[in-house]
């Protein structure tokens, strides 16, 4: 079979099903990535969300015996919000990162990959394939880099010449020996804007990320957020775009190619106070379609509390007192107490002290004491 012709046929077909960029790579082991992952593991830079088996992350043969090549795909997503609602005193709003706008991208990319699989099976009935998006074993970034989708930027994102880094990535391992594409040369040069601006210093050096410091990771954790990071969250409800928005390669990049990726402004820039008491049913109905809902509502509610503290939003004090007193989840009770201490105001200290009288959880009591300390500092 003429595999070069088949490759061209696949490229042509990909354009008809809404794939913005496609590349082909060999399925040989990712030896350089393996060394980086071992180092990351030794330095404790991993988030815990990734596949723990480094061999599986770097050897496609373990995932599909007889693998010959990997097809990488990229879909561009919007970077600008049309008709964005204003955040103002009394009506403060949070923000979801761009990668969580619209329908869950895992579903969108899986749809494209399934169509690609069906096309290839029709051409080659005996073909073997294994597709994955984000949560699969392989590193999307390493595959895309090898397949010429883009280069791996210092912000730890794949940067494409056509769409910047505002792209979702997915891949398909196959036993078909497609001719590989050439990687794109690194075009970051001496620029360090992303490293310099990272709020928590998570970008240790070019292409190296301490995931446990990354705000995108921190917003997804479920426990108490370490106090050193709370002020740095700002009004972020889920994820962080800072290292992308500052990137010169993203200037002017805003693509609205896929209707299912179009964001609802009220969802991706939501009012903060209503989030504090949203029911499970309402949360699933409103936010269930978004990738940002995958960890459930508690982390987002905790982040909404931190955002209200960031704004020092006095109008939210009654709601925060209600959460501190009555919410069954210790993380939210304690975070609300801390936030009340940050905001301050008449009656706040008394409310915290009264709540302490019946609070049994040690971590919550610690946060309540911390809230009182913050109030005392305001009086000094």
Curated annotation (Swiss-Prot):
Gene Ontology terms describing biological process: queuosine biosynthetic process; tRNA modification
Signal peptide span: none
UniProt GO MF annotations: 4 iron, 4 sulfur cluster binding; epoxyqueuosine reductase activity; metal ion binding
InterPro entries tied to this protein: 4Fe4S_Fe-S-bd, 4Fe4S_Fe_S_CS, ARM-like, ARM-type_fold, PBS_lyase_HEAT, QueG, QueG_DUF1730
Residues that coordinate or bind [4Fe-4S] cluster 2: 198, 214, 240, 243
Subcellular location: Cytoplasm
Note describing how the cofactor binds: Binds 2 [4Fe-4S] clusters per monomer.
Cofactor(s) required, per the database record: cob(II)alamin; [4Fe-4S] cluster
Residues annotated for [4Fe-4S] cluster 1 binding in this entry: 188, 191, 194, 247
Job description of the protein: Catalyzes the conversion of epoxyqueuosine (oQ) to queuosine (Q), which is a hypermodified base found in the wobble positions of tRNA(Asp), tRNA(Asn), tRNA(His) and tRNA(Tyr).
Subunit structure, interactors included: Monomer.
Family that this chain belongs to: Belongs to the QueG family.
Protein name (record): Epoxyqueuosine reductase
Organism listed in the record: Bacillus cereus (strain ATCC 14579 / DSM 31 / CCUG 7414 / JCM 2152 / NBRC 15305 / NCIMB 9373 / NCTC 2599 / NRRL B-3711)
């Amino acid at each position: 079979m003429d595999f070069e012709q088949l490759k061209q046929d696949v490229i042509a077909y990909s354009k008809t099903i809404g794939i913005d960029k496609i590349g082909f790579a060999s399925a040989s082991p990712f030896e350089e990535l393996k060394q980086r992952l071992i180092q990351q593991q030794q330095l404790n830079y991993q988030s815990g969300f990734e596949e723990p088996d480094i061999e599986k992350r770097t050897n496609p043969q373990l995932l599909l015996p007889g693998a010959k090549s990997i097809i990488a795909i990229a879909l561009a997503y919007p970077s600008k919000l049309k008709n964005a609602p204003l955040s103002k005193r009394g009506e403060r709003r949070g923000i979801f990162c761009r990668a969580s706008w619209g329908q869950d991208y895992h579903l969108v990319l899986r749809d494209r990959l399934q169509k690609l699989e069906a096309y290839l099976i029709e051409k080659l009935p005996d073909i073997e394939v294994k597709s994955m998006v984000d949560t699969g074993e392989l590193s999307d970034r390493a595959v895309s880099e090898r397949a010429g989708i883009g280069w791996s930027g210092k912000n730890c994102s794949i940067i494409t010449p056509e769409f910047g880094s505002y792209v979702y990535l997915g891949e398909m391992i196959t036993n078909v020996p497609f001719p590989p594409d050439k990687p794109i040369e690194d075009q970051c040069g001496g620029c360090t804007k992303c490293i310099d601006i990272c709020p928590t210093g998570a970008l240790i050096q070019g292409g190296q990320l301490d995931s446990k410091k990354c705000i995108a990771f921190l917003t997804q954790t479920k426990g108490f957020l370490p106090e050193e990071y709370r002020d740095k969250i700002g009004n972020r409800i889920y994820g962080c775009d800072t290292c992308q928005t500052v990137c010169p390669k993203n200037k002017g990049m805003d693509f609205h190619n896929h209707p299912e990726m179009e964001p609802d402004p009220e969802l991706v820039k939501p009012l903060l106070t209503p989030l504090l008491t949203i029911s499970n049913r309402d949360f699933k109905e409103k936010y269930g379609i978004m990738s940002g809902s995958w960890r459930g509502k508690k982390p987002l509610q905790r982040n909404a509390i931190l955002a209200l503290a960031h704004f020092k939003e006095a109008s939210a004090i009654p709601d925060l007192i209600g959460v501190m007193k009555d919410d069954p989840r210790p993380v939210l009770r304690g975070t609300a107490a801390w936030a009340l201490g940050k905001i301050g105001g008449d009656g706040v200290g008394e409310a915290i002290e009264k709540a302490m009288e019946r609070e049994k959880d040690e971590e919550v009591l610690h946060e309540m004491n911390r809230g009182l300390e913050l109030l005392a500092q305001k009086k000094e």
